[in-house]
């Protein structure tokens, strides 16, 4: 089945309750084998954290909660990727030993990886996909989640399903489907109530205006003067530098205090993740490369560090190339810390599953880049209290409503959009279109090969 919804609608809570129900109602002599997975290590860690928190308040017997796993895998690790990531141990001839597979952030999965995953799941097993179809699709081929959702109506069900639902719950709250049945009929639900950001709040209304492509309403809300949503047009380099040193500098200073006082790793990562600078592009005045350089200059000056030093306490790094030997993957974030326990002055701390941390020499890392600013693509699967979203100086085909939506929904409490209004309007009016043929095959009930 597929559970869709924007961040904060309760997708993970819903799947935890589904797992508890399936475990408790199972007639199998042995416990159900359940696997949790996500496309990236960062998303897998967030899934673990969410499941762990939900289990603490789940109204189920302890023996049921104990059978809901907390360890989550990247899809590549779950499938048993080889050293270069081109083939997998688990496939049709050697399927996954799982009765249920739960995959979060499904919008990030490209078509080839989804094909490998489906091939490795036994036909008798259940697959539960969680995701937000309004977010950016994978950089690689396909828009799998959107294509899967395309053939069927959301939140409308067959008469047979409505009858079973009424018998089980006594409720007539669901609506009947008016479309022809497909293989996805009764297998999709869209969660619409947001428990984190109220629909009537300024951020909730702003999100809706972007999803629907209502550029006029998007602009109206940006100009409303609400504290949690602001707009800023920085006309030149001088204005940008000043903004980095003042407004963004407040958050950098707060993070730097934790670095200087050697806060424990949890506090340090929490401070770092309290804000993020997101960019549509890597290049240009408002791209990640330039903004990272400005923020690094600010931090080095504050810390008295020579501008030429590549590593220094507090530097944030993002892995950009998978290293299966080190178990580091594209998108993993590490923070450089002073290290008096080794011969080298610095080590890079990475957050891992179940609250664990791992330190590595910065000189052993695969390809990486500074990560105070990151692209919207790289931010998928993460959320921050405060987000600064930078648009480029000129219109670009990569700008579309999916990118804007993904960027703004990373913000939990406060959002600042930096850029020209006409650039934003064009982006919101532009919808990304991809064609893979998957929608038609699902609608017609054809096998997907």
Predicted regions and their residues:
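Short, charged/polar "capping" segments at the starts of alpha-helices
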Residues: 44-45, 285-287, 423-427
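Residue-level recognition of short, solvent-exposed, well-ordered loop/turn junctions
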Residues: 122, 310-313, 329, 379
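Structural beta-sheet core signal
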Residues: 36, 129, 277-279, 389, ...
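Short glycine-/polar-rich loops that comprise or flank the Walker A/P-loop
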Residues: 31-32, 98, 123-126, 184-188, ...
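Residue-level signature of catalytic and energy-coupling elements of molecular machines
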Residues: 74, 104, 132, 191, ...
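ASCE P-loop NTPase helicase motor core
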Residues: 1-221
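C-terminal accessory regions
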Residues: 332-449
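Conserved helicase motor core of P-loop NTPases
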Residues: 134-317, 323-326
């Amino acid at each position: 089945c597929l559970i869709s919804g924007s961040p904060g609608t309760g997708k993970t809570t819903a799947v935890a309750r589904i797992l508890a129900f399936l475990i408790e109602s199972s007639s199998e002599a042995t416990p159900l084998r359940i696997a949790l997975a996500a496309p990236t290590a960062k998303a897998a860690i967030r899934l673990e954290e969410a499941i762990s928190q939900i289990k603490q308040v789940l109204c189920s017997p302890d023996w049921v909660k104990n059978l809901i796993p907390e360890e989550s895998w990247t899809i590549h690790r779950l499938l048993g990727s080889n050293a270069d990531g081109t083939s997998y141990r688990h496939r049709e001839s050697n399927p996954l030993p799982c009765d249920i597979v739960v995959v979060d952030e499904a919008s990030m999965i490209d078509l080839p990886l989804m094909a490998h995953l489906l091939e490795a799941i036994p036909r008798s097993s259940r697959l539960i996909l969680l995701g937000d179809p309004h977010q950016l699709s994978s950089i690689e081929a396909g828009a799998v989640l959107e294509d899967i959702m395309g053939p069927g109506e959301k939140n409308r069900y067959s008469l047979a399903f409505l009858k079973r639902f009424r018998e089980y719950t006594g409720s007539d709250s669901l609506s009947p489907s008016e479309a022809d049945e497909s293989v996805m009929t009764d297998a999709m639900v869209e969660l619409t109530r947001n428990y984190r950001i109220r629909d009537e709040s300024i951020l909730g209304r702003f999100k809706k205006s972007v999803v629907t492509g209502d550029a006029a309403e998007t602009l109206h809300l940006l100009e409303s003067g609400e504290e949690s949503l602001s707009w800023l047009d920085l006309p030149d380099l001088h204005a940008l530098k000043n903004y980095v040193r003042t407004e963004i500098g407040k958050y950098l200073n707060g993070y730097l205090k934790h670095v200087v006082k050697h806060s424990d790793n949890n506090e340090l990562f929490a401070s770092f993740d309290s804000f993020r600078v997101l960019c549509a592009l890597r290049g240009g005045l408002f791209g990640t490369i330039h903004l990272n350089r400005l923020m690094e200059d600010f931090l080095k000056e504050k810390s008295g560090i020579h501008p030429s030093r590549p590593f220094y306490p507090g530097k944030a790094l993002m892995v950009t190339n998978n290293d299966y030997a080190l178990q580091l993957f594209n998108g993993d974030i590490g923070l450089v810390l002073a290290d008096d326990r080794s011969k080298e002055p610095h080590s890079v701390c990475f957050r891992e599953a179940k609250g664990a941390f791992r330190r590595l020499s910065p000189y052993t890392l695969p390809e990486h880049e500074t990560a105070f600013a990151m692209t919207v693509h790289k931010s998928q699967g993460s959320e921050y209290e405060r987000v600064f979203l930078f648009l480029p100086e000129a219109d670009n085909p990569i700008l579309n409503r999916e990118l804007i939506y993904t960027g703004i929904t990373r913000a939990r409490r406060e959002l600042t959009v930096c850029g020209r209004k006409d650039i934003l309007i064009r982006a919101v009016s532009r919808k990304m279109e991809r064609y893979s043929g998957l929608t038609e095959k699902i609608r017609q009930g054809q096998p997907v090969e």
